[in-house]
Amino acid sequence: MADFETTVYNDQTFTEVWAYAWCRLGAENVTIGDNIYDFFNDMINQAFDKNIIVFFHNLKFDGSFLLNFMLSQDTFKQATYQDRHGDWHFKKSDELKNGEFSYMISDMGQWYDIALKWHGHLITFRDSLKLLPFSVAKIGKDFSTKHQKTSIEYTGERHAGGVITDEERQYIANDVLVMSEALQIFFKLAENKPTIGSCCMHDYRKMTKKEDWEADFPDMYDEPIDPKAFDAENADQYIRRSYKGGWVYVVEGKENKIFTKGVTADVNSLYPSMMSSQSGNFYPVGVPRFYKGDTISKQYLDKTKYYYFVRIRTRFYLKQGKLPFIVINGSWRYPSRTPLKSSDVLDENGEYCEYIRTESGEIEDTSVVLTLTCTDWELLQEHYNLIDCQILDYCVFKAKIGIFDTYIDKYSKIKKESKGAKRQVAKLFLNNLYGKMAQSTNSSFKIARLSDGVLKFTTQKANDRKPMYIPIGSAITSYSRAFTIRAAQKNFHGVGERGFIYADTDSIHCDLPPAEVQGIEIHPVDFCCWKLENYWDKAIFVRAKTYIEHTTHEDGEKVNPYYLIKCAGMSKGAKENFNNMLISGEASLTDFKVGLEVDGKLLPKQIKGGTLLVETTFKIHPKK
């Protein structure tokens, strides 16, 4: 386990490692040094007679210093090559020659690993944040590690080769000792894989017979279909259009208002609940059959035997008193990530239009083509009036229940019977299998270079990753959305009435006393049940993932009241600053709105040497 401390001072144009620390997993002896050259020498010496894996907690930050250093040294060479089509590739790690290095940075900027070959052995730098996705402080607390994170003043004149004080040594040593102990515990319970998702999938596959896996989860890319008939080249492409995330929604008309005396209810492990047979949910398996036609055969409506995906063309209008959930991303007609009340298009005057003029000047109606799971299709008919609705085609799978039970039951039992680290690891394994099921072939990655000493990146498109089984990935998230939406609907009594206000994936927020929350079963731990996570005496909900609740109770027990601030993109420092403003009276809840500016945001910026966290102002911008 390793960690870098890097320079932060005023008017900085160059950054460097002024302190590093590393230790073996589970060991108490920490090696501390004062420059990146010595760090590399340490790692090379450790890898003299064996391959080693070195973890950093947030490789995106520390890794920028590693790449910057290696790209600036003639000793090391980036292991890239071009094929005859002009596309770039990295050599595989077992093909590297001495002094060559490769790395995996996704097209979305996720850093996974950096591999360097030296003395015939591999030094692989990995990101422990991909295994334990929490801060070092939280990991130390949750895992009850012997050592706990401390703090120092980050800003100040420090440089490579300088004096490291005893306080600074203690600080950086504690960081690696916390993570060293936590990872040692983790690897006693899990395989050494690059991400928590891959750990989960590895464990799940071990529980599944090879012949069952091949029969239940075939490669959907290997199932070609007629693109002229189904507007897709294979089953994966057809079904993937139905794949959506969680339902996040503030009731229109309840935004930016102060609500009082409310409660927030959370589902106990939403995705594992929906995957468990306790939910009654059946899941698609095997190879689909595709059909054209404007009706779905009656036999396929039996959800205990079949699961289907359907493609429709329709206009839709929200029914009176119902909550919206249809989201259409990637279209100029509609705002992204926004549940829609209608397929009609809002003009510049805020009026809905049933017809639009295209760029070519043609007039067309606002009908849309949607690919839906059977769960979403049923919910669509419950919540919307459908006009000129036509089923274009559909595909049908055989359905099974309980295919995740062995896995879910294993980690549910550990979670219920354990405390501390073991319980936290069980929670990670419960909550991180579902996303891996939706893995696509997209393996696009970034290639780094130095431009005037600053790290720059170019994206190379690639599609050679082994996909998982999108039918189940889509079905899991669909069942989960429906579970939350139906609970919210039972507590929605109108815009001007007390009741449901906001939902975020696995939670509903209502200005109701706990006894008046309807349609949900309350239990502290059971699957498919809800717990009343917190009571609040006042709250404001601005938009998706942007709200504040003044919490008075947690899990039904009184606590010292505090402001729970949730705001996408708002750093911990900015939240602390605004919290202090609320406590002092300098700000009120109504100041939490579009246009708010608060100091304390740290913005990563590439400069010579590596990444600098630049303090700037956080602002709630209007939604694009």
Identify the meaning behind each predicted range.
Residues 3-10:
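Ser/Thr-glycine-rich phosphate-binding loops at phosphate-binding pockets of nucleotides
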Residues 10-58, 64-624:
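Conserved acidic
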Residues 1-3, 17:
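Glycine-rich short-loop/terminal segments
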